[in-house]
Amino acid sequence: MAVIYWDRSKIVWSFEPWSLRLTWYGVFFTVGIFLACLSARYLALSYYGLKDHLSFSKSQLRVALENFFIYSILFIVPGARLAYVIFYGWSFYLQHPEEIIQIWHGGLSSHGGVLGFLLWAAIFSWIYKKKISKLTFLFLTDLCGSVFGIAAFFIRLGNFWNQEIVGTPTSLPWGVVFSDPMQGVQGVPVHPVQLYEGISYLVVSGILYFLSYKRYLHLGKGYVTSIACISVAFIRFFAEYVKSHQGKVLAEDCLLTIGQILSIPLFLFGVALLIICSLKARRHRSHI
């Protein structure tokens, strides 16, 4: 049986006297966020009908978007960390509270990151509602919903490189044997579930970006956000079935993992938003 053996170093650079380390996960995380922000800014400036808006200049819009992306990290990362602490390691962090801020030891939840982003989008749109009224909550979330897959792909690629969030054992020819996995069994071929997820997110996001970029379909406000939320929840829910769950279940007899439980509210939010947007679009068409 042909398998892939993964034995790459997790460290790019280290300075032992000060215990400083640059990990490949950190590199992929940074590159993914940076490329996603660049793509979103380009899309907003060129293809979302803003460049001809008379109430503000293109440079003002560029600065506003850059501020939005830069400061979003202050909500995404803490949100991801807090959700991980609460849902994935509460008993441990209750005994070792000093570890909560030691984010370099690992431990981020994508669901918490999404919640942190949505909170920041709401705050930012409120701050800018008089300066640039076009930057509404749904505009910002639609914009990022078109490019989220870029960041998600690189983050999952970082997980793969870091040998974490590994899959369950498999006999498929593309099974991966990790030399030093953070979970699961060493020396056993497993599903490269990190790549399953990352590629799926990238495909969904690519389709949404293409539709927004080419404007082949007239997607109204909120549609990209709702489709992105539904897709992410769907992908994450089923990816959990081939993940090594590290005991992250609500109880021994529970059929769902915490990752699946947390995906349900995201799915419901996406469905509710899709229904609301569809009803508004229908009412709008009836008045034309």
From Swiss-Prot:
Entry superkingdom: Bacteria
TM spans (from-to): 18-38, 68-88, 107-127, 135-155, 193-213, 222-242, 256-276
One Pfam family this sequence matches: LGT
Keyword Transferase: yes
Molecular function in Gene Ontology: phosphatidylglycerol-prolipoprotein diacylglyceryl transferase activity
Pathway named in the protein's UniProt entry: Protein modification; lipoprotein biosynthesis (diacylglyceryl transfer)
Cellular component, GO annotation: plasma membrane
Record key words, sorted: Cell inner membrane, Cell membrane, Membrane, Transferase, Transmembrane, Transmembrane helix
Role of this protein: Catalyzes the transfer of the diacylglyceryl group from phosphatidylglycerol to the sulfhydryl group of the N-terminal cysteine of a prolipoprotein, the first step in the formation of mature lipoproteins.
PANTHER family: PHOSPHATIDYLGLYCEROL--PROLIPOPROTEIN DIACYLGLYCERYL TRANSFERASE, PROLIPOPROTEIN DIACYLGLYCERYL TRANSFERASE
Family per record: Belongs to the Lgt family.
Protein's UniProt name: Phosphatidylglycerol--prolipoprotein diacylglyceryl transferase
Organism: Chlamydia pneumoniae
Origin organism lineage: Bacteria, Pseudomonadati, Chlamydiota, Chlamydiia, Chlamydiales
Gene (UniProt): lgt
